[in-house]
Regions:
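Solvent-exposed serine/threonine-rich low-complexity stretches and specific carbohydrate-binding patches
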Residues: 396-407, 444
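Short beta-strand elements
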Residues: 436-449
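Noncatalytic carbohydrate-binding groove/subsite architecture in carbohydrate-active enzymes
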Residues: 71, 86-91, 129-278, 282
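Surface-exposed, short loops/turns at beta-strand junctions within beta-sandwich domains
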Residues: 414-421
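Substrate-binding cleft and catalytic face of glycoside hydrolase catalytic domains
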Residues: 24-170, 208, 316
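Boundary/entry segment of secreted carbohydrate-active catalytic domains
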Residues: 1-36
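Aromatic-rich peripheral "rim/lid" segments of glycoside hydrolase catalytic domains that contact
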Residues: 16, 45, 113, 117-118, ...
């Protein structure tokens, strides 16, 4: 699972500057970053300046082993791509991005098309949904354009806000994710399309405010979809896309924005401007860290989820914006950085929490060296408990048990083996927290000199 951050601070004019910002993300434990690229009407290709900036991002990410997700979006509701010409331009622009940046595999199409800030109109004059059918047409066109560049590209649709009013007469017309996905599915069926429109769903599962714990943010009786509403989301996807060429209940899910705002301590207050909206309800840093850990645990246990992206790594300066980062605006670390980094590490190692029904199978490698003394080097992709057995023919010559940390080589002494004899070494591996069947590794047979 990707555990990353939505953070445009890595968009820098030089590689050196981009690398400094990317290093900060790695310090927090993230293995992915989502950045945005704005499309404007009439554009069909990248400017030289934007291409240089994005190549710096991609190069810095490669140096740090970070995966890049690229959101292609219009800026605000005045540039919504509503006509066939605008959709063609948008799709050509996305394809140009993919051609210029072949290292980028993941593309998110649009941003929160279910709310009026990013997409208008939301409703037709008769009160029916105008946004979902128009977005479906854009997503289909972008999907085809990106796949024409490379079939390996993963197109993520939606990037949906978790809330919405579903009231065409509201002064702020919006759609709930439930209504928007329902209407998106209806538009897809009406198109008679025989190909998918997305390879995964992007969703922004924010809670009602920052004081709500992710594990408590369940909405069985409303149209909101937050982190703990996974079962509701999967059921909805199965309903709206079932029986079509578009995957529904098995569609991969990417939570590409989730944030909890933290209170700014007095010692850092002078770094910030503006006033915090009363509706935000920021929490102490320790609570922010605990909530981010809950978010990681929830996503880790949800079978279709492939990614969780926090919003942001670094605070925004304006208190009317987002102070949801793990670093203050001056790039110094918040007190909960270590807690969140540990949760991310444990998720990558498969031990962040126990999940009912989850059965992990460690994968790894086993190499034996005979000098200076016989020893095996075991490397597991996730944490593993191991039983290493040395055999000479059918006889067990040595056996050792232990636990290895995922991604870290474990050296295991093989006991006193006799010179001139041939041996075979095997390792039986199991996941310590969410065990499935054992994985058995076999090293190349060897002789002790």
């Amino acid at each position: 699972m990707l555990i990353g951050v939505a953070e445009d601070s890595v968009r820098r004019p030089t590689l050196a500057e981009a690398k400094v910002e990317m290093d900060l993300l790695v310090q927090a434990g993230f293995n992915a970053v989502r950045v945005t690229q704005i499309w404007a009407p009439g554009e069909t290709k990248l400017s030289a300046a934007d291409q240089r900036i994005l190549r710096n991002v991609v190069q810095a990410a490669r140096l740090d082993g970070v995966q890049v997700l690229l959101t292609v979006m219009n800026f605000g509701n005045r540039t919504t791509p509503l006509t066939e010409q605008r959709r063609e331009e948008f799709a050509a622009y996305a394809a140009a991005l993919a051609s210029a940046l072949p290292q980028v595999r993941y593309f998110v199409i649009g941003n929160e098309p279910n709310i009026n800030r990013y997409w208008l109109p939301q409703f037709s004059p008769d009160g029916t949904d105008a946004a979902a059918p128009a977005y479906e047409a854009l997503l289909a066109r972008a999907y085809d354009a990106l796949n024409a560049v490379s079939s390996k590209i993963v197109v993520l649709g939606g990037a949906i806000s978790p809330h919405g009013g579903d009231d065409p007469d509201s002064i702020r017309p919006t759609h709930s994710p439930t209504a928007f996905l329902t209407d998106l599915g209806a538009a897809y069926r009406a198109s008679s399309r025989t190909k998918p429109i997305m390879d995964g769903l992007a969703l922004h599962p924010y809670e009602d405010n920052s004081s709500v714990a992710p594990i408590d943010g369940v909405h069985p009786n409303s149209t909101t979809i937050a982190l703990a509403d996974y079962d509701k989301l999967v059921t909805l996807l199965g309903t709206v896309f079932g029986g079509t060429a578009q995957r529904g209940s098995t569609l991969p899910i990417y939570y590409d924005e989730f944030g909890v705002e933290a209170q700014i301590p007095p010692a850092k207050a002078s770094l910030y401007t503006g006033r915090e909206p009363v509706t935000v309800k920021p929490v102490p840093e320790a609570v922010q860290g605990a909530y981010y850990r809950q978010a990681v645990e929830l996503a880790f246990c949800q079978p279709n989820v492939r990614g969780l992206f926090l919003f942001h790594a670094i605070d925004e300066r304006d208190l009317n914006r987002w102070q949801s980062g793990l670093f203050y605006i001056d790039r110094s670390a918040k007190s909960d950085l270590r807690l969140v980094r540990a949760a991310i590490s444990q998720a990558h190692r498969g031990v962040v929490t126990h999940c009912p029904g989850l059965a992990l199978l460690p994968r790894g490698s086993l190499v034996v060296a005979v000098r200076p003394v016989p020893q095996a080097t075991l490397l597991c992709d996730i944490d593993c408990t191991y039983v290493v057995t040395v055999r000479r023919g059918s006889r067990v010559a040595d056996r050792s048990r232990g636990r290895a940390v995922g991604g870290q080589a474990k050296r295991i002494r093989l006991g006193l083996l006799r010179s001139g004899l041939h041996y075979m070494v095997t390792a039986s591996l199991s996941a310590p927290v969410n065990p499935g069947h054992a994985t058995v590794l076999r090293a190349v047979p060897f002789a002790v000199p």
